[in-house]
Design a protein with these regions (language model features):
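N-terminal module-boundary/linker segments of secreted carbohydrate-active enzymes
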Residues: 5-7, 13-58, 190-194, 201-210
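Compositionally biased, low-complexity repeat tracts
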Residues: 6-8, 30, 82, 90, ...
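N-terminal export and membrane-targeting signals
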Residues: 1-3
Length: 210
């Protein structure tokens, strides 16, 4: 999946170079301006939810569940695709929780767009091609398996309005937001940049994830 997304965005070499850049330096390379109107935003602007963009037979949600959890078992008859059970150490709270596939239980573990799609839309994604928006919505760089209630609490918030309760994860979290915004040419608002810089000054050697 990662190779395909890099190909779609033309970002391979640039992203590898960015990996050696500190997040604090990288945030200064982002354009700073106010949010654009939400006019025209719909989830469908980023493609149907959880496509199989790498054509491995599994949708993006299951790819990320498989990446982020341990002790995984799969639904009978789905080979190694549909995750039926797994254990997640939630990055946002530090708590260990179980994922059990089912109508009433699947949503307890959700896949968070670290840069929320509506936030992305209002900070430049409305200018991107449909292909790049689909790539962003399915990019492992922008996706984490997390506690569902915290994902819902975050909603479409940026770093100025929401941060993970687990303070030790905040540097990694905002660095990932910076990496996504840099990769897709998105901007940050003044309040968002101030919040990110405040966090990153506590961890000045934090690098960008790729």
């Amino acid at each position: 999946m990662i190779a395909l997304v890099l190909a779609l965005t033309g970002a391979g070499v640039e992203n590898l170079a960015a990996a050696s850049m500190t997040a604090l330096k990288a945030v200064d390379s982002l354009v700073v301006k106010g949010r654009a109107p939400k006019t025209g935003y719909a989830r469908s602007e980023f493609g149907r939810a959880w496509l199989d963009v790498d054509h491995n037979g599994c949708d993006t949600r299951n790819d990320i569940l498989r990446r982020d959890m341990v002790g995984i078992t799969f639904k009978a008859g789905s080979a190694t695709c549909l995750v039926a059970f797994g254990k997640l150490i939630d990055p946002y709270s530090g708590a260990t929780m179980s994922f059990v596939r089912g109508v009433k239980t699947s949503a307890l573990v959700q896949i968070d767009h670290v840069v929320a799609l509506s936030n992305a839309w209002q900070t430049g994604a409305f200018k991107l091609s449909a292909e790049k928006r689909i790539a962003m919505a399915n990019d492992p760089l922008n996706l984490l398996a997390v506690n569902g209630s915290l994902n819902e609490q975050k909603s479409d918030g940026d770093a100025a309005t929401w941060l993970p309760p687990l303070k030790s994860y905040r540097c990694s979290y905002v660095a990932r937001q910076v990496a996504v915004k840099k990769k897709y040419g998105l901007w940050v608002t003044p309040a968002e940049k101030a919040a990110i810089v405040k966090i990153l000054t506590t961890c000045p050697k934090q690098t960008l994830p790729v």
